[in-house]
Design a protein with these regions (language model features):
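Terminal amphipathic alpha-helical/low-complexity segments used for targeting or macromolecular assembly
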Residues: 1-92
Length: 92
């Protein structure tokens, strides 16, 4: 399954900073994400490591300062990421 960042941002009511047409193919934990995955950084621990991440996109808190990564700002990154996980892996 594939989805664009703009579609993800609409799903989670987030704000994209970066390439809104980027296509995401999956979800992964922060330290395991590849260039085709989206992940989230909801704590200071992970926000400090954002520049080292290989993720294609990262969901961050709305007050996070802009980075050179493709990000989606959300009110609650953990909840937003859970919504994206449910999109990729719907419960039957």
């Amino acid at each position: 399954m594939k989805i664009s960042l703009v579609s993800i941002s609409e799903l989670i009511e987030g704000e994209i900073i970066g390439d809104e047409n980027k296509v995401i193919c999956g979800v992964a934990p922060f330290e395991e994400a590849t260039s085709q995955d989206i992940t989230y950084a909801g704590s200071t621990k992970y926000l400090k490591k954002i520049y080292d991440s290989n993720a294609g996109a990262i969901i961050v808190p709305r007050d996070f300062q802009t980075s050179d990564k493709d990000i989606i700002k959300a009110d609650n990154p953990r909840v937003a990421f859970a919504q994206v996980v449910n999109f990729f892996h719907p419960k039957s």
